[in-house]
Amino acid sequence: IGQIYGIRKDYPNAILWYKKAIRKNYIDYMAHWFLADIYTSTNRVNDAVDEIVIAKILNRNNPRIQNAMEAIFTKAKIHYEDWCFNPQYELGKNADSSINVTADEKWLGFALVKAVWEYEPGYRESMGVAKNNYAIIEDRESIISLYMGLTNSKTKFNKDPQFKVLKKALDEKFMDPYIIYEIILPKTPSAAYQLSEEVINLMKEYVLKIRCDK
C-alpha cells in the first residue's frame, strides 16, 4: 500500500503505511528502504539516513541498497568507505596432527585464537559452545588478540580501514556491532533477522558514529 501512495506522490500516506509495516515487522528491510526513498523525496534527509542504514543492516549485501545508501549519504554529506573485513590467514592440520598456522604478520594474533577455537580439544566446549556451533565470544577473543598484536607492534591503524574502524569501535565500546556488521552479516546476511530492534538500532549507531565520517 505504501508503494501505491508513493507512486501517486501521496507522501504523507506512503509514510504512514510504511511505518505501519515497520511496526508490524521491524525486520522488513524493504519497508525501511522504501521509507528512506520517500524521506529523500520530501527532503527529510536525516530520517532517510536512519532508514537506509537499517535497510542496509537487514540486507547487508544488497547492491541496490548500497547504491541507495551512497546516494542518500552524499546528500547528507556523510562519507562511507565500502571495504570488507578480510583476515589474512590459513589454518590446517598436518598428517602428524600438528597444527599449521599461516598468517600475515598483522593477522597472527587473530589467526592463533581461531586455531585454538578450531583445534584445541575441549576449548570450545569449555567456553560453553557446542561443537560446530558459532558464538560471538569466538570473534570477541580473536578481535581482542588482533588489536593487542597491532598495538604491541606499533602498527599505524589509519593505513588500513579495517584496523582504523576496529580501533575506533573498541575505543567507543562498539566491539559487538563491529563483529556483527563487519564479520557476521557479510557472510550470513540472514542472521540480521534474529536481531532485536534494540540491537538493530545499536548497529545503526555503529554505522553512523564509527563506520562513517561526517
Please report, for each region that a protein language model flagged, where it lies by residue.
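Helix-start (N-cap) detector for alpha-helical repeat units in TPR-like alpha-solenoids
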Residues: 29-30, 63
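Alpha-helical linker/edge segments of TPR/alpha-solenoid repeat scaffolds
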Residues: 72-98
